[in-house]
Regions:
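N-terminal helical cap/lid subdomain that shapes the substrate entry/recognition surface
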Residues: 2-90
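Residue-level marker of regulatory loop/turn positions in helix-turn-helix DNA-binding domains and
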Residues: 88, 106, 139
Length: 205
C-alpha cells in the first residue's frame, strides 16, 4: 500500500523566512496601516497578533475588519522580482522524487502564490493536488474546519503530514494523521510522531 504525503509549503518546502516573508509582511503592515488608520509599528503588532491567534493574519482581518480576502491576497502577495526571493530547501527535488506515494500540498497561502513557488522550485509535477487558502474558504490551518475540508476533498484518512508549525500538526493528529515536525525548536510534544531539522531527513532513514 502506497503512503500518502501531505506537505505544507512555506518554511517546509522553501525557506520563506529568509527572503519572501519579510517582503509580504511589509506589504501586509502597509495594508493594515492604511485600512484602519494606525501607525506602521502598530500594524506590525496587529499582524503578528492575528497570525498567532488564528494561524493567518487574514483570518483576523476578516473577523474584525470585514476585509475582502481576495483583494487582500492580491495586494499583499503580488511581488516584483518574485523568483529572486524563493529559496528551496536543501535536497528538495531529491527528497520529493525519492518519497513514494501520493503527495498533496496543503497551504495557508493563496493559489497563485503557491503555483508560482512550485514552478520556481521545479516541483509542481510531484503533487497530485494543491489545497490553498481559497479551497478552505479562507479558513486557515490549524482550524479544524480547514482540515475537514482538505481531508474530504482528497478522501484522506491516513497520511504523513509534514509541517513546520506544531499547532497545525496538533490538529492533524486529532484526525488520525501521522505527524512530522520540521523544526530546530527544542521539545517534542506528544502529538508529534517524528521531528526533523531538515526536509532531506525524510529519506535518510
Amino acid at each position: 500500500m502506497e503512503h500518502t504525503w501531505i506537505f505544507d509549503l512555506d518554511n517546509t518546502l522553501h525557506d520563506s523566512q529568509k527572503k519572501i516573508f519579510p517582503v509580504i509582511n511589509h506589504k501586509i503592515n502597509i495594508y493594515i496601516s492604511e485600512l484602519i488608520k494606525i501607525k506602521y509599528i502598530e500594524a506590525d503588532k496587529l499582524r503578528q497578533k492575528y497570525w498567532d491567534k488564528y494561524g493567518a493574519t487574514l483570518e483576523g482581518l476578516i473577523k474584525h475588519h470585514k476585509v475582502n480576502p481576495s483583494k487582500f491576497l492580491e495586494e499583499t502577495h503580488t511581488i516584483e522580482n518574485f523568483s529572486e526571493l524563493i529559496v528551496p530547501m536543501p535536497g528538495l527535488v531529491k527528497t520529493l522524487s525519492s518519497l513514494k506515494g501520493k503527495k498533496v500540498l496543503y497551504t495557508n497561502g493563496p493559489k497563485n502564490y503557491t503555483n508560482m513557488i512550485l514552478k520556481e522550485c521545479k516541483i509542481e509535477h510531484f503533487f497530485d493536488g494543491i489545497f490553498s487558502i481559497e479551497d478552505s474558504k479562507f479558513v486557515p490551518k490549524p482550524n479544524e474546519i480547514s482540515m475537514e475540508l482538505f481531508l474530504d476533498k482528497y478522501q484522506i484518512s491516513k497520511a504523513y503530514f509534514v509541517d513546520d508549525i506544531k499547532e497545525n500538526l496538533e490538529t492533524a493528529k486529532k484526525f488520525g494523521l501521522s505527524t512530522i515536525w520540521i523544526t530546530d525548536e527544542v521539545g517534542h510534544p506528544s502529538y508529534i510522531d517524528k521531528k526533523i531539522c531538515e526536509l532531506s531527513e525524510l529519506i535518510k532513514n
